[in-house]
C-alpha cells in the first residue's frame, strides 16, 4: 500500500521551512528509508533556490516535482506564506517517471507537448500507465496545441490533470521544481502506472445567465466580436456599465461574471476569465475560445462556489469505488491533491476558511495537500475521463490517488 507522509511549515526562512516540512512529512511515514516521490507546493515569495538546495541535501536522489503558487492548501490551513510537502513510498508494482519541457513560450506548443510525452514515457515500456500530473509555472500561449502534442504520444483519451501556477502578466513569477532543478517558462510532469489507481473531479459552481451568444471572431485568447458586435458589449448589456467604467472594472467583475463556453456533449461550461478590454472593444481572456463557440455570461454566489467542492470530491470518489484495484480487496491507502483557482480565493475572501472546511469535511480522513492556481488542466467528462483535456479557469479540482 502507498506510504504517505505530509508535512507543512510556515517558517519565514525558506531553508528552515523546507527542513521543517521534510521532517514532519518523514514523521508521518511508516518507512522513511523508502521514498519514491516527493511532491511540493510553496508560496511564491520563498526563495526557490533555497528550497531546492534543501531538498537536494535532505532527500538526496528522491524524485521531486512541484512548484510555487499564490497560496498553499494544507490540513493546517490556507496560507499565503507556507510550504506543504508529500513524501510517497510506492507499493510493489507501482511506478512513476518525471520529466520537463522548457522554453515553451519560445517553441512550437505542439512540439513541446510531444517532447514532454516522449520523456514521460521513457522507461514505461510494458508497464500500464494510468495518469499524468502536469504543472506549468504560468499560463501559456497555444495551450490547446500543447495538449494536442501531448496526446499525440500519450493517447487521445489518456487522463491528465494539472495546473498553471501563475498568470501571464504576474510580476511575481512562479517556479517549478524537478528533482534538483528550478526553472520557469516550462512544464513539468509525472506519469503514474502499475498498481496505482485514481479518481478526479472538477467543478466550478457558476451558472449560466441570460441567453446564449455566438463568438463570431477570435484570435487565440482574444474575442473580437460576439453576435457580430464588439465583444465588450456583452458586459455592457448585462451589467449596464458605461464603457469607461466597464474597462476599469472588468477584470474584477469577470471573477463574478466569467464567460462560459458551451462544449457539446458536456454538462459543465468551460469558464474563461476576462483579463482586459482593448480600445476597439475586444475582450482578452485567460485562455483560448474557438471561433463559432456558443457562450453565456456566468454568475455565482459564495454558496454555489463552495458547493462545487463536495461535488468534485464526490465525482472523484465515485470513480475510485469502481476501480479494479478497489475490487481486488487489496489493502490500500490514498491521498488527495487539490487545485483551487485564485479567482475563487478572491471571491470568497474573508470566507476562505469555509473552502478549507468543505475540503476537510468532504475528504474525511483522506490526507491532502494543494495549491491555488491561475488555471487548471483536466478533462470535463465524468465517465472514465476519456475525453479531451481542457485548460480551465475558476474551477476546483481534486485528484485522489490510491495504491
Regions found by a protein language model. Give the residues of each.
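Small-residue-enriched flexible segments
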Residues: 1-37, 41-58, 62-63, 67-71, ...
Amino acid at each position: 500500500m502507498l506510504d504517505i507522509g505530509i508535512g507543512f511549515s510556515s517558517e519565514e526562512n525558506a531553508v528552515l521551512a523546507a527542513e521543517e516540512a521534510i521532517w514532519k512529512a518523514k514523521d508521518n511515514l511508516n518507512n522513511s528509508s523508502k521514498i519514491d516521490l516527493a511532491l511540493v507546493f510553496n508560496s511564491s515569495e520563498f526563495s526557490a533556490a533555497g528550497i531546492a538546495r534543501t531538498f537536494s541535501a535532505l532527500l538526496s536522489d528522491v524524485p521531486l516535482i512541484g512548484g510555487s503558487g499564490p497560496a498553499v492548501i494544507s490540513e493546517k490551513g490556507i496560507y499565503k506564506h507556507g510550504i506543504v510537502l508529500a513524501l510517497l513510498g510506492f507499493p510493489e508494482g507501482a511506478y512513476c517517471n518525471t520529466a520537463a519541457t522548457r522554453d515553451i513560450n519560445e517553441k512550437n506548443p505542439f512540439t513541446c507537448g510531444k517532447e514532454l510525452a516522449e520523456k514521460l514515457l521513457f522507461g514505461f515500456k510494458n508497464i500500464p500507465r494510468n495518469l499524468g500530473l502536469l504543472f506549468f509555472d504560468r499560463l501559456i500561449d497555444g495551450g490547446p496545441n500543447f495538449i494536442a502534442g501531448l496526446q499525440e504520444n500519450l493517447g487521445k483519451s489518456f487522463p491528465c490533470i494539472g495546473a498553471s501556477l501563475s498568470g501571464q502578466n504576474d510580476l511575481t513569477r512562479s517556479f517549478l521544481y524537478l528533482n534538483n532543478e528550478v526553472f520557469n517558462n516550462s512544464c513539468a510532469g509525472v506519469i503514474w502506472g502499475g498498481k496505482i489507481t485514481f479518481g478526479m473531479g472538477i467543478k466550478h459552481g457558476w451558472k449560466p445567465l441570460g441567453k446564449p451568444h455566438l463568438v463570431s471572431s477570435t484570435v487565440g485568447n482574444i474575442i473580437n466580436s460576439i453576435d457580430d458586435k464588439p465583444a465588450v458589449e456583452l458586459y455592457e448589456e448585462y451589467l449596464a456599465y458605461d464603457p469607461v467604467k466597464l474597462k476599469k472594472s472588468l477584470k474584477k467583475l469577470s471573477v463574478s461574471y466569467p464567460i462560459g463556453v458551451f462544449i457539446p456533449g458536456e454538462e459543465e461550461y468551460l469558464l474563461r476569465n476576462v483579463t482586459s478590454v482593448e480600445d476597439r472593444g475586444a475582450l482578452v481572456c485567460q485562455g483560448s475560445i474557438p471561433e463559432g463557440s456558443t457562450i453565456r455570461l456566468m454568475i455565482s454566489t459564495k454558496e454555489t462556489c463552495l458547493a462545487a467542492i463536495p461535488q468534485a470530491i464526490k465525482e472523484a470518489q465515485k470513480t475510485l469505488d469502481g476501480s479494479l484495484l478497489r475490487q481486488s480487496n487489496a489493502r490500500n491507502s490514498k491521498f488527495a491533491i487539490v487545485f483551487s483557482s485564485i479567482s475563487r480565493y478572491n471571491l470568497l475572501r474573508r470566507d476562505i476558511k469555509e473552502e478549507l472546511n468543505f475540503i476537510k469535511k468532504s475528504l474525511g480522513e483522506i490526507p491532502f495537500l494543494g495549491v491555488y492556481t491561475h488555471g487548471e488542466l483536466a478533462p470535463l467528462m465524468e465517465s472514465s475521463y476519456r475525453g479531451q483535456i481542457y485548460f480551465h479557469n475558476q474551477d476546483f479540482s481534486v485528484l485522489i490517488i490510491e495504491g
